[in-house]
Amino acid sequence: VTGVQTCALPIFRAIENVRILGPVRKASQVEVSATDAIKLGMKVPVRESGDVKGSAPIAIVGPKGAIYLNEGCIVAMRHIHMSPKDAQAAGVKDGDIVSVKADNERGTIFNQVKIRVDDSFTLEMHIDTDEANAAKIATGNTVTIIK
């Protein structure tokens, strides 16, 4: 055989020491940061937690075996959990999309932040590690909804 040929080999990329969290959902899901997705060599959609239909496939390997999910890997959409009382005070309702300002040395504004309201929620914004690191935000910092 002459000419240039292409050989393809399976490449195993992994993120080790991943925490498994509850509560149990209707469908298994894995939330990764955009950086994790790049490391894994995957195209992962940004979705609201629980919205896994048509999302990226992923394997989960543990000490007692492995499972393969045909779909279920997402980058979680940034969101704020709040109680109905907090929502009323902020002038927002469940499902609203707002902007949030981190008024620190990075001066970051996060757009497309979904409001999630439930009696069981404590006021807290959820962003991934990429977003937190870029904006120099840590647990306990305060941000402002600017709508």
Where are these regions (language model features)?
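Structural and coupling elements of P-loop NTPases
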Residues: 11-14
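Short, small-residue-biased leader/transition segments that mark boundaries at the very start
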Residues: 2-9
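Beta-strand/loop-dominated core regions that host nucleotide or nucleotide-derived cofactor-binding catalytic loops
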Residues: 16-84, 97-147
